[in-house]
UniProtKB/Swiss-Prot annotation:
Belongs to the MAPEG family. Its main location: membrane. This is Uncharacterized protein sll1147. GO terms for biological process: leukotriene metabolic process. The keyword Membrane applies. The keyword Transmembrane applies. Coiled coil: none annotated. The chain crosses the membrane at residues 5-25, 79-99, 109-129. GO terms for molecular function: glutathione peroxidase activity; glutathione transferase activity. InterPro entries: MAPEG, MAPEG-like_dom_sf, Membr-assoc_MAPEG. Keywords: Cell membrane, Membrane, Transmembrane, Transmembrane helix. It is found in: Cell membrane. Pfam families: MAPEG.
Length: 137
């Protein structure tokens, strides 16, 4: 596999990192807007939703990024990038919805979670398949 074949997953990784940076900045802006100064993490529901988006996205990145790269390497980098783009869309919809109301976050959460699960399970199955092929020789 060449570096060129991995450009799309690399782009998705860079975009996911940029998305996370924007979410971190949003927390800083929300702190100022709602008067919740560090180290406090509670005190205003609107602020707490903005903070929760950032926390949850960090949690999801720990699952998403390994899945993206393992799928790209052991299955298909183009499909990995497409699923990664779906994850990004899901995270954006999740943030947009959650910023408005907790009840509005589920579509984005489901979209992001489903794409992550496909990446991780697909990567695992591809790795197991390749290990099985090696053991047959």
């Amino acid at each position: 596999m060449t570096k060129t074949e991995l450009l799309w997953p690399a782009l998705i990784t860079a975009l996911a990192t940029m998305l996370y940076l924007v979410l971190v900045i949003n927390v800083g802006r929300a702190r100022a807007k709602y008067g919740v100064m560090p180290p406090a993490t509670t005190g205003n529901e609107d602020f707490e939703r903005v903070l929760r988006v950032q926390y949850n996205t960090l949690e999801q990145l720990a699952f998403f990024l390994p899945g993206l790269w393992l799928f790209a390497i052991y299955r298909d980098p183009t499909i990995a990038a497409i699923l990664g783009a779906v994850w990004l869309l899901g995270r954006i919809l999740y943030a947009w919805g959650y910023y408005q109301a907790a009840e509005k976050r589920m579509v984005g959460f489901a979209l992001g979670s489903l794409s992550s699960m496909i990446l991780v399970v697909g990567a695992l199955l591809s790795i197991l398949w390749q290990l099985r092929q090696l053991s047959q020789f």
